[in-house]
Amino acid sequence: MNTNRRKKGRKKKDVETMTAPEPFSPAAVKQLTARVPEVQRALLDNLDAFPQYPETPLLKAGDQYEGIWLEHNQDNFFLADYAPESAWGSQDAFLRFQREDGLFPFALPLNYRKEGNFFYGYDRCFWHVQTVWPFARCAMEIARKTGRPEEDFARIYRGAAAYDSWFVHHRCEAESGLPAMYCEYDTGHDNSPRVTDGGIPHSCPGDDANNMPDLPEMPILSVDLSAALYGGRIALAELADLLGKNAEAAEWRAKAEMTRLAIRRYLYDEEDEFYYDRATTGFRKYRTEHVTRLFLNRVLTQEEFDRVYERYFCTPGREFLPPYPLPSVSIDDPSFRHGIRNSWGGNTQALTSLRALFWMGYYHRGTDREALLLRWMKAFEEHPESTFQQELDPFTGAPIGDGVNYTPTLLLFLEAAKLPQFTSGRPV
């Protein structure tokens, strides 16, 4: 289905702008491909039994994130190739623990019964939103991939519609209809100046995502939450189509179009050709990877995408194209911070790159998709000390932090290992 209003005609060819690293030597190819079984085992070792959901093991984000996170839900799309019941289990768990007002938990912690644990006493958490790839889209694609019955698509539809309603009633600003960001973790951008400057708290007041902090700039209309709202509405329209709810499908598409137009009207800076959050005082001009979430949710037309991408993602050594691409903040932005652990203030994040696999091909950047995966593979080759941490130095590819087997990083390795130069002579 055409959800991005492309004109009919000859298919646009892929455009190459992201340079792939030098070819891997035969020895490097052999060394890297030999690790595939080990990495697959590490991925499956991240499955764990959750006391609040005993039906099937669920996929943790990694050793330093012992739980399932809503912002990590796309990890389950890839997991479905290895453990389909567990991939669906996370969707079922989020639906089961959805709050009565429609809010999904941002996390289901694993060790909530353990005294001294950060999440002690919380088997589900509603402290902030932390949504990126909409639940409606992710759950629907996983349900398709794992062959779920129609009743599960109906559950997804009901749950996602209630979630949309929660946003409308608790986060969407009246004039624009766009959702506001209330706290740092709403968007998952830990330690990014974009979501901390001005005294913005980590979580919402009272540990409840309904509550807006009493700050002069609030509410702050959020680019990425607006993108997720749009993407969720397009997915809801597709679900309604599947369920034979044609009138409701049309309503969701109309709502999505209103969101798309509002994003353009309120959040786009024509001079900068960039999308910014808008506070009561005006644009908050941080050039961060939040713009890729417009790509992820296919908010932009091809022409709009090309304008942003070619200005900010196509010049080597500038903006979002350092040697290890897609840093969390443009390397030319004054707020860029280098070398800080667990920082969306500058480091190249595995989550950003994993999500890019969903949008690069759609926007005719398939060659860049391959080049991005090869850059990650080059980092694994050149830094054998890597334990599959969550982030890289954008200039050297060196792993940052001491985490082990972060799920998105494992998945990037496995996806890169499917590229032709690594699959010759072995089954995928």
Please report, for each region that a protein language model flagged, where it lies by residue:
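Short Lys/Arg-rich cationic patches that frequently serve as NLS/NoLS or arginine-rich RNA/DNA-binding motifs
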Residues: 2-14, 180-181, 190
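Extended glycan-interaction surfaces of carbohydrate-active proteins
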Residues: 20-67, 91-125, 173-220, 261-348, ...
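Extended, well-ordered alpha-helical scaffold segments
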Residues: 27-42, 83-96, 149-168, 232, ...
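Alpha-helical support elements that line or immediately flank enzyme active sites
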Residues: 70-101, 290-302, 353-366, 370-376
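Core register positions within helices of long alpha-helical scaffolds
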Residues: 79, 138-141, 232, 239, ...
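TPR repeat positional signature
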Residues: 132, 136-139, 226, 233, ...
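Acidic/aromatic-lined carbohydrate-recognition and catalytic surfaces
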Residues: 135-162, 172-174
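Short, contiguous, pocket-lining structural segments
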Residues: 217-231, 248-251, 255, 286, ...
